[in-house]
């Protein structure tokens, strides 16, 4: 398949093919079997542990078993040949991420959970040999966990150029000061590494080259975990934490990439991670739709099954159509990420899928809750938790408005490059009087 640039977009010579490869089919079969035999039976126990605010101890045993089965690091196309696990392309991994999404903790079993997956992707891309040995190797092995500290409570973090946490260079040392929050994963007892985005003390006027990413040991002097922040009253065992950095000193060798490259590194981290998030979200929507269909078939009201009520049929049909639309959009982005020459509109694609998936989840789950009635509000089904998570997703990893802005800017940029392209489609009086000529 050949890919050529055309008017700011990408012209596909040949075709996009989203059919699952035989390799993806085989690994999906193995994953589904593992989920059914080993993970789903522990789901109630996991929720019991989560309700107590602690990680479930048995997850470590499941992780060891998954690694033995090769169901490990599946989300990393660039996985080194000597690293544990199985490398899959973004497109091949997408259906596996969807299957994992049905349980909030399944991705963790396979070492494919955020933020570790994105952090490993970033370290594979930009870490020095020493950083790879100290941080990447144990992350790939699953012996440590990590977190990514970007958002801040004192600025509008939806614009990352606002970030105020500061890093300065003192000889061969980096000194970090600032406050971060919603640092996912930082409360996990095995979290050893914080990737911290901070503004350079010597930053110039170029806002997009004013920040750097520093690798900070979680137990470094001056790092204070202030609290694990509940998200809509739910306290995640792994944490969405507020952290204060006071005169935290690390060797200059813990700078990731180049000085001032933090913004570009953070952007590069987002693409694969959003495909993973969105496919897991689609898996959750499939779960919600499946539960709603079962409920509609077995529940009766006003003398007939809910499945025969016209409005319920509309809800189910709308959900099926919207899920399939969203899946195709995400698969296109996964395919684009796999191309040797990424399409010119890849950034807009990534923004679009994040927006679509988060909104989709709220709509599909809301309909399912309506089918279930009071039970849909209870903890007896996963629906209330899924709805809550869908609402959080519309802010986490960038609010809807930022993604809409990205898509609109790309569209307007292309329109500006093609001014006048659509003028002949007007039917003004002058055009109506014009005499068309074939020759």
Enumerate the predicted regions with their spans.
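Flexible, small-/acidic-enriched active-site or ligand-binding loops
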Residues: 162, 221-249
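Short glycine/proline-enriched turns and hinge-like loops at secondary-structure junctions
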Residues: 87-88, 158-161, 186-191, 206-210, ...
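A short core secondary-structure module
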Residues: 173, 177-225
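Alpha-helical interface subdomain recognition
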Residues: 13-104, 113, 126-131, 138, ...
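N-terminal glycine-rich flavin-associated loop
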Residues: 108-130, 159
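Long, acidic (Asp/Glu-rich), low-complexity accessory segments flanking structured domains
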Residues: 247-264
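A short, Trp-centered hydrophobic/proline-enriched beta-strand micro-motif
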Residues: 142-151, 196
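N-terminal amphipathic/basic-hydrophobic helices that include classical n-h-c signal peptides
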Residues: 1-15
């Amino acid at each position: 398949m050949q890919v050529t640039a055309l008017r700011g977009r990408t012209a596909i010579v040949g075709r996009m093919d989203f059919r699952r490869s035989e390799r993806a089919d085989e690994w999906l079969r193995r994953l589904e079997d593992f989920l059914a035999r080993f993970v789903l039976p522990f789901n109630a126990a996991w929720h019991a542990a989560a309700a107590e605010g602690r990680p479930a101890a048995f997850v470590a045993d499941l992780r060891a078993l998954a690694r033995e089965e090769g169901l490990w690091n599946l989300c990393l196309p660039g996985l080194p040949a000597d690293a544990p696990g199985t490398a899959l392309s973004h497109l091949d991994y997408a259906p596996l991420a969807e299957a994992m999404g049905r349980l909030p903790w399944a991705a963790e079993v396979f070492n494919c959970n955020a933020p570790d997956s994105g952090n490993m992707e970033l370290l594979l891309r930009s870490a020095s040999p020493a950083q790879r040995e100290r941080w990447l190797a144990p992350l790939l092995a699953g012996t440590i966990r990590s977190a990514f500290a970007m958002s801040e409570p004192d600025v509008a973090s939806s614009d990352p150029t606002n970030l105020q946490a500061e890093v300065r260079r003192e000889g061969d040392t980096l000194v970090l000061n600032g406050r971060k929050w919603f640092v996912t994963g930082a409360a996990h007892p095995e979290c050893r590494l914080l990737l911290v985005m901070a503004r350079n003390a010597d930053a110039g006027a170029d806002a997009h080259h004013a920040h750097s990413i520093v690798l900070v040991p979680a137990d470094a002097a001056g790092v204070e975990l202030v609290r694990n922040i509940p998200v809509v009253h739910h306290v995640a065992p792994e944490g969405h934490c507020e952290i204060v950095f006071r005169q935290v000193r690390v060797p200059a060798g813990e700078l990731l990439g180049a000085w001032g490259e933090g913004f570009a590194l953070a952007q590069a981290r987002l693409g694969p991670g959003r495909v993973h998030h969105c496919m897991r979200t689609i898996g959750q929507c499939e779960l919600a739709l499946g539960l709603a269909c079962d409920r509609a078939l077995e529940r009766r009201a006003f003398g007939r099954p809910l499945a025969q009520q016209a409005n319920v049929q509309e809800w189910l049909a709308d959900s099926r159509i919207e899920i399939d639309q969203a899946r195709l959009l995400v698969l296109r982005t996964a395919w684009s990420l796999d191309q040797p020459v990424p399409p010119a509109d890849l950034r807009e694609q990534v923004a679009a899928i994040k927006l679509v998936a988060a909104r989709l989840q709220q709509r599909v789950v809301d309909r399912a809750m309506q089918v279930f009635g009071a039970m849909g509000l209870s903890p007896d089904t996963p629906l209330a938790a899924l709805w809550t998570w869908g609402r959080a997703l519309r802010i986490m990893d960038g609010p809807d408005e930022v993604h809409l802005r990205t898509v609109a800017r790309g569209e307007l940029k292309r329109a500006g490059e093609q001014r006048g392209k659509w003028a002949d489609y007007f039917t003004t009086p002058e055009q109506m009087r014009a005499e068309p000529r074939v020759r």
